[in-house]
C-alpha cells in the first residue's frame, strides 16, 4: 500500500498482452497457463491477456495470433486463484462483441484505449463494460503527443463515460520524468477517479517514470516481467517492485517469486534479450508507437532502407496506433528517394 495514502497501489502485469508484440502474437496456451500460474502465486494483482493490439487484434494488419485470444484468456482465468484477468480493447479494433465474450469467460477488468485526443470514441465501450459489471479504465495512448490541457480534457470525457480510472499511457516511451510529473499532477487535480500510468522503456526511464507517477498520486501502474513488452518493454516488474519496497511501499507481492518468474518462466520465452537497441531507442527519441518496431524492421529489410529512417519519418508525421499501413508507405518512399540520389 502506498505510504500515507488512502488507496493501495495496484499493478497490472502486461507481459502476456504487451509482450505479445515481441512474441509476434505466437503465445501458446501452455505458456500463458504457466506464466499466469506463477504470477498468481506471487500475488500479482491483475494479469492482462489478449492480442498485443487488444481484443480483436488478430488480423493481417496487426499480426495473426497462433491461438485464439479467447482460449488464452480462458486459460489465464482458469489458472488464477486470487489475481484478476484484464483485457485491453481499442475501439475500432475490438468491439463490444469481443468484450462480452471476454467478460463471460471471466475477465474482470478492461482498459479501453484510444489515442490521447480521441477519447470520445470510448463512450460506448466504457458504458457497456460497466453494464457487464467489469472494472473499466480509460487508457489514453501516446500521451506525450498532446498538451497537458488536452490530456486533462480527454481524461474528463472518459471519467464522464464511467471510467473508474484513467491512465497516462506512454506508448512511445518518449516521456521524461518531469513530463510524467506534470501530467499526473494535472489529472490528480482535475479528476475524481484513480489515475494510472503505463510506461515503455525506450529511453531507459520506465521505472523512474512509474515511481514519479506514484509520487504524484497514481494508484494503478503497469509492469512487464523481464521487460517483455513492445519496443524495449515496459517498467520491468521485478525491478519496480524492488525499488518500491526500498521506498517503503508494500504491495503484498512476493519479490523473490517475481524474480523466479522472470528468470525461469519468462526469460526462456524471449526471442532475443529485451534490451534498448537502436530501433527502440529511436522510437523513444522520435515519439513513435512502440509496437511499430518489428513492422518497421521488416519493412526496412524488404525495401533495403534503414529502420531508423522509417521511424524518424513516422515520428515527423505523428502517426498513431492503427496506422501500421503507413510504415510500408514510408519505407517505399525512402527507397525511391535512395534510388534517385
From Swiss-Prot:
UniProt enzyme class: lyase
Residue ranges constituting the Pyruvate carboxyltransferase domain according to the UniProt record: 9-259
Annotated substrate binding sites: 17-18, 171, 198, 289
Residues that, per the record, bind Mn(2+): 18, 198, 200
Presence of keyword Transferase: no
Gene3D superfamilies, alphabetized: 1.10.8.60, Aldolase class I (3.20.20.70)
Alphabetical UniProt keywords: Aromatic hydrocarbons catabolism, Lyase, Manganese, Metal-binding
GO molecular function: 2-isopropylmalate synthase activity; 4-hydroxy-2-oxovalerate aldolase activity; manganese ion binding
Site feature: Transition state stabilizer: 17
BP GO annotations: catabolic process; L-leucine biosynthetic process
Active site: 21
Cross-referenced NCBIfam families: 4OH_2_O_val_ald, PRK08195.1
PANTHER family recorded: 2-ISOPROPYLMALATE SYNTHASE 1, CHLOROPLASTIC-RELATED, HOMOCITRATE SYNTHASE-RELATED
Protein family (similarity comment): Belongs to the 4-hydroxy-2-oxovalerate aldolase family.
Protein name: 4-hydroxy-2-oxovalerate aldolase
Amino acid at each position: 500500500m502506498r505510504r500515507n495514502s488512502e488507496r493501495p497501489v495496484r499493478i497490472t502485469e502486461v507481459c502476456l498482452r504487451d509482450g505479445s508484440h515481441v512474441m509476434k502474437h505466437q503465445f501458446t496456451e501452455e505458456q500463458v497457463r504457466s506464466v499466469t500460474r506463477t504470477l498468481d502465486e506471487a500475488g500479482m494483482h491483475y494479469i492482462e491477456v489478449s492480442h498485443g493490439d487488444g481484443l480483436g487484434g488478430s488480423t493481417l494488419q496487426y499480426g495473426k495470433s497462433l491461438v485464439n485470444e479467447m482460449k488464452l484468456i480462458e486459460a489465464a482465468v482458469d489458472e488464477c486463484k486470487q489475481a484478476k484477468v484484464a483485457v485491453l480493447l481499442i475501439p475500432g479494433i475490438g468491439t463490444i462483441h469481443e468484450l462480452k465474450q471476454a467478460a463471460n469467460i471471466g475477465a474482470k477488468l478492461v482498459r479501453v484505449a484510444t489515442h490521447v485526443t480521441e477519447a470520445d470514441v470510448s463512450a460506448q465501450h466504457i458504458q457497456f463494460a460497466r453494464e457487464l459489471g467489469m472494472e473499466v479504465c480509460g487508457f489514453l495512448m501516446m500521451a506525450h503527443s498532446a498538451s497537458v490541457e488536452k490530456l486533462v480534457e480527454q481524461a474528463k470525457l472518459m471519467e464522464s463515460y464511467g471510467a473508474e480510472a484513467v491512465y497516462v499511457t506512454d506508448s512511445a516511451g518518449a516521456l521524461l520524468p518531469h513530463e510524467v510529473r506534470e501530467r499526473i499532477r494535472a489529472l490528480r487535480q482535475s479528476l475524481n477517479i484513480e489515475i494510472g500510468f503505463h510506461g515503455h522503456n525506450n529511453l531507459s526511464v520506465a521505472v523512474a517514470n512509474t515511481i514519479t507517477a506514484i509520487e504524484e498520486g497514481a494508484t494503478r501502474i503497469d509492469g512487464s516481467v523481464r521487460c517483455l513488452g513492445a519496443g524495449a518493454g515496459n517498467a520491468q516488474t521485478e525491478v519496480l517492485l524492488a525499488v518500491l519496497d526500498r521506498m517503503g511501499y508494500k504491495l503484498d507481492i512476493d519479490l523473490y517469486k517475481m524474480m523466479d518468474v522472470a528468470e525461469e518462466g519468462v526469460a526462456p520465452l524471449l526471442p532475443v534479450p529485451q534490451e534498448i537497441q537502436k530501433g527502440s531507442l529511436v522510437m523513444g527519441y522520435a515519439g513513435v508507437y512502440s509496437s511499430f518496431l518489428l513492422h518497421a524492421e521488416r519493412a526496412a529489410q524488404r525495401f533495403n532502407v534503414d529502420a531508423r529512417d522509417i521511424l524518424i519519418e513516422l515520428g515527423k508525421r505523428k502517426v498513431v496506433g492503427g496506422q501500421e499501413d503507413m510504415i510500408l508507405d514510408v519505407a517505399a518512399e525512402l527507397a525511391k528517394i535512395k534510388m534517385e540520389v
